[in-house]
Design a protein with these regions (language model features):
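Extended, helix-rich scaffolding/adaptor regions
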Residues: 1-110, 125
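Alpha-helical solenoid scaffolds in large eukaryotic transport, assembly, and signaling factors
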Residues: 92, 96-194, 199-200, 206, ...
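Hydrophobic core segments within long, regular secondary-structure runs in both alpha-
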Residues: 24-31, 148, 182-189, 225-228
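Short, Lys/Arg-enriched charge-dense amphipathic segments
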Residues: 42-46, 206-208, 225-226
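Eukaryote-biased recognition of long, low-complexity, charge-rich segments
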Residues: 220-234
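Positions within ordered alpha-helical repeat solenoids
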Residues: 9-12, 28-35, 59, 63-66, ...
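Solenoid-repeat scaffolds in large eukaryotic assemblies
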Residues: 3, 19, 200, 220-221
Length: 234
């Protein structure tokens, strides 16, 4: 209860109304749970409800902390997050970036037949695409279901250069170091199974770091616990 009160106080300084709404819903669920306990109700799902309440509280606190630091911190991470994205880049979703990266090898081969200048243009465009993909992924605190699906396409693509995939894995790992996101953790576990050994090992290193950082929170997520139980290597 004290944690919820402190979080409510923190959110008064936060401009995100969605987070406030989530907190209000969480507080309501917590009150109902306490009332059922006072009535002596035998609820077999009580422990699961409690774990979800704690997990949601952590996540709201994470998002609130980031939003407040975005307005105050001089760290490059927060500078990138608070800098408005140019309108010309608004259409560059992860799916769009994937298509651009997939065409790199063909574009490079064609440009090599034309001129060194054309080849330099392709190389520069590829470098800029990677930079934008990295920054966008690193500073994204929570994937939407659509973004998670696009990230899965990165793993299944047969045209994406492995080095580009490895950079994306690093960006996901660094993003998780800034803010917990269950979707990204589950994705890293998928990436660990990638057939390319370099991609798989990079994902494994990321998983180990993330599991250490959030070791006190992992048990709150049943799906994650079940997933890890099936992986003897970790």
């Amino acid at each position: 209860k004290e944690a919820l009160m402190q979080l409510e106080s923190l959110l008064w300084q936060c401009p995100d109304w969605d987070l406030r709404t989530r907190l209000e819903q969480l507080q309501t669920s917590y009150k109902y749970m306490l009332e059922y306990m006072r009535q002596g109700a035998n609820d077999p799902e009580r422990w699961n409800v409690y774990r979800k309440l704690v997990a949601d509280t952590w996540e709201i606190a994470d998002r609130s902390r980031l939003l407040m630091l975005d307005n105050a911190s001089s760290r490059y991470y927060h500078e990138v997050r608070r800098t408005p994205r140019p309108e010309s880049l608004s259409a560059y979703t992860l799916k769009k970036l994937l298509h651009m990266l997939e065409s790199f090898n063909d574009d490079l081969a064609v440009s090599g037949l034309l001129s060194d200048e054309k080849m330099d243009e392709v190389l520069k465009r590829h470098e800029e695409t990677l930079k934008y993909m990295f920054l966008q992924t690193w500073t994204n605190s929570a994937w939407t279901p659509e973004e998670e699906e696009d990230a899965q396409s990165m793993l299944t693509s047969e045209l994406l250069p492995v080095n580009d995939l490895c950079l994306f894995i690093s960006a996901v790992t660094l993003s998780l170091m800034e803010c917990f996101d269950l979707r990204k953790i589950m994705w890293l576990l998928d990436a660990y199974r990638h057939p390319d050994v370099n991609a798989g090992q990079r994902a494994l290193v990321g998983v180990i770091f993330i599991f250490h950082i959030y070791r006190n929170r992992l048990s709150l997520y049943n799906d994650l616990v079940k997933r890890v139980d099936l992986m003897d290597e970790i």
